[in-house]
Amino acid sequence: MKLGSTEEKSGGGCSLPTEVSPPALQQAFSKILHGLSRQESSGQGNAGNAALRDLGALIEATECDKLFEGTGGGGSPREMPEILGQVAKALEKFAAPKEKADGSEEHPEVPEKATEVGLLFLKLLGKVETAKSSPVCPAWKTGLRHLSGPTYIFAITHRLKQPWTSPKSQHVAGEVLSLLFRVTECSSVAEFLCGENKDDRGRFAVVLGLLKPHLNKETWKKNPAVKHVFSWTLQQVTQPWLSQHLEKILPPSLLISDDYQTDNKVLGVQCLHHIVINVPAADLLQYNRAQVLYHALFNHLYMPEHRLIQAVLLCLLDLFPVLEKALHWQGEAARASTHCHEVLQLVLTHMESEHRLLLRRTYARNLPAFVKKLGILTARHLKRLEQVILGYLEVYDEPEDESRLKILETLKLVMQYTWPRIPCRVVVLLKALLKLICDIARDTIPTTEAAKSAVLQEATDCLILLDHCSQGQVKGLLANIALSCDDSTVVSCIRKVQGSAEAPGEDPGDD
């Protein structure tokens, strides 16, 4: 867009020739906004591209005092900064990916638009940087306050590898974010969002306000980037800044986690987990929020998706202490571990019948944490734990045998916590452990040498602990086997058990 003779720049400083009146400048920006909105509504790219070209020319032709100071007459001094904020919002929306009618994740048209828009953001931020060093442009702070939120959302949308980005658009978005941090004098995303001190409140609330219209049930899928921007931004904010925004961040996180697509479920659960570990228990217990979280997470355990199960179990393990506090406060200390018992019972039910290796691995990976959490109360589940342990020891998990290593870790913990209940199970457990050692020794299992060594060591430790729980019964039962066995690996393990004097590992009560 040309401003005719009024585009001539003055020789020094940040002033625009007086021939260009502030109302004319506002009108020019309004016309560009109209062009961008028309492209959004009609889907015609020409209007949007022309508007981008006009905007670039207008930014270059306008000096910083006119760009940030507002009207020169009787108008409000906030008008131009507010208009710049509207322009920034329009640019961010123009470059954002849109939901495809056919459900496709490809957005071939977006990277080029994002690159052009990114260059315009660089020009706008460049004007701010120039104004900061000019004594005649004091209103740059107001302008930056309106620009920073949309600029940040644009940069986070396009800076990482996504279906709607290209290396070029990622590079430009990265430059935009770097320049934004420079002009705001922030050294990190966390400082930008949270502020440096009590006087600087940060921009997290501003970003949430801009995202809010796009994070309700009707709109959150129209822009496939918004969930990623929300999730990534949320996880940059930690204690103690997060709790004051709880009412704004909890509903979108629950909404995303409740979707039918697994990727969205996992993303939502990760958001919920971040909230659980960064918001005080008192805030989570207020208005029964913790119970809402628990029921939402518990229902996900019925989904046979290993990534989702992993995210949910990790979140629940951090949520249990919050739920226990509520029961303690209600004078029900005896029922404090009720939720953990419920989850472990369901997990064991799924483990008994699960045949998919990824899910078996996920369940086994998290089982030790539940045993540690319950401690001696694990005895309530001992019969079912025994069946799960015996079943999982029979199936290898190539290439690292992670499932059996975690099951052996679980067995050690169970024996340490529930040792009075172990003597009656000595024979069953001894047979399972010896069979495992023999299978490893015969080299019939396609796992790595490191995994085989680790399994042998863990199995031997379990035998030593089993012997201590049974007051030496295992050594007596192994005596004849050591004499008749000709496999050096098996004999070596037996000799370690026979020569042991103390149970391996530390007392779990010291954790």
From Swiss-Prot:
One Gene Ontology cellular component: TTT Hsp90 cochaperone complex
SUPFAM superfamilies, per the entry: ARM repeat
Subunit structure: Component of the TTT complex composed of TELO2, TTI1 and TTI2. Interacts with TELO2 and TTI1. Interacts with WAC; WAC positively regulates MTOR activity by promoting the assembly of the TTT complex and the RUVBL complex composed of RUVBL1 and RUVBL2 into the TTT-RUVBL complex which leads to the dimerization of the mTORC1 complex and its subsequent activation.
Protein name: TELO2-interacting protein 2
Family matches, as InterPro entries: ARM-type_fold, Tti2
Function according to Swiss-Prot or TrEMBL: Regulator of the DNA damage response (DDR). Part of the TTT complex that is required to stabilize protein levels of the phosphatidylinositol 3-kinase-related protein kinase (PIKK) family proteins. The TTT complex is involved in the cellular resistance to DNA damage stresses, like ionizing radiation (IR), ultraviolet (UV) and mitomycin C (MMC). Together with the TTT complex and HSP90 may participate in the proper folding of newly synthesized PIKKs.
Family: Belongs to the TTI2 family.
Bias type Basic and acidic residues, positions: 1-10
Gene: Tti2
Disordered as annotated region, ranges: 1-21
